[in-house]
Amino acid sequence: MSKQPHILVSNDDGYLAPGLLALVNAVRPLGRITVIAPEQNHSGASNSLTLSRPLSIHRVAGGERDGFFFVNGTPTDCVHVAMTGFLDEKPDLVISGINQGENMGEDTLYSGTVAAAVEGVMFGVPGIAFSQIDRGWNRIEDAAKAAHDVVAQMLVSALARTEGTATLLNVNIPNRPYADLYRWRVTRLGNRHHSQPVVVQDSPRGEKIYWIGAAGEVKEGSEGTDFHAIAEGCISITPMQLDLTHHARLAAMRANGWDRG
């Protein structure tokens, strides 16, 4: 890119999340940065938009997050308002994360982290979602350095200038020192078994309450999948698309007379 690229950064863990701050600091040398993130944690929000109430946007003044914007909405809300009026012009790249925990296989359908990158692609802007394979933040700076390398590669790649549908990448980073994060694998999504059963408890009022169970174990994690790459200690980079059409089944249904009239 001839001009300094404009990078929009969001997440689903909220604007105070350590993963967001680490990502922003890591990519600052790569371009002009705008941060618009949710006010609260919206993990599992997927591509939900807030339509039942107005949204408000506030700017952080002072501290290490000075200049960050936060929205009382979802990750998708954040990128949507940025693209449809809050920003004077569309950014060159949308990045999201770094998420606290992996987003692999079917996780991507539920993930607010992935959804923020997806929303950028909906507006023709390449998007990258970053997640770290850990529920803690003990190696978040290492993951951020690796994310910097992926963003730098994207900015000089033909993928960033592809005509037509913008590129969408889902990146999962092992919980390892940066020196060990030099191996990248381009992968496909693996597959999990169904989630664990809901956890049933009694509320103080004697009512049954239900907690969503833990993610299922890996069902299909063969070579070439995101699960396999992570198990091998590699960064997993999965190109994704918005078109959910099952094209082979579409052709089969047409061939078998499903078209009528």
From Swiss-Prot:
Residue pairs linked by disulfide bridges in the UniProt entry: none
The keyword DNA damage is assigned to this record: no
GO molecular function, one term: 5'-nucleotidase activity
Biological function: Nucleotidase that shows phosphatase activity on nucleoside 5'-monophosphates.
EC numbers, comma separated: 3.1.3.5
Lineage: Bacteria, Pseudomonadati, Pseudomonadota, Betaproteobacteria, Burkholderiales
Cofactor note as given: Binds 1 divalent metal cation per subunit.
The protein's name in its UniProt record: 5'-nucleotidase SurE
Binding site for a divalent metal cation: D12, D13, S43, N99
Gene3D superfamilies: Survival protein SurE-like phosphatase/nucleotidase
One GO cellular component, as annotated: cytoplasm
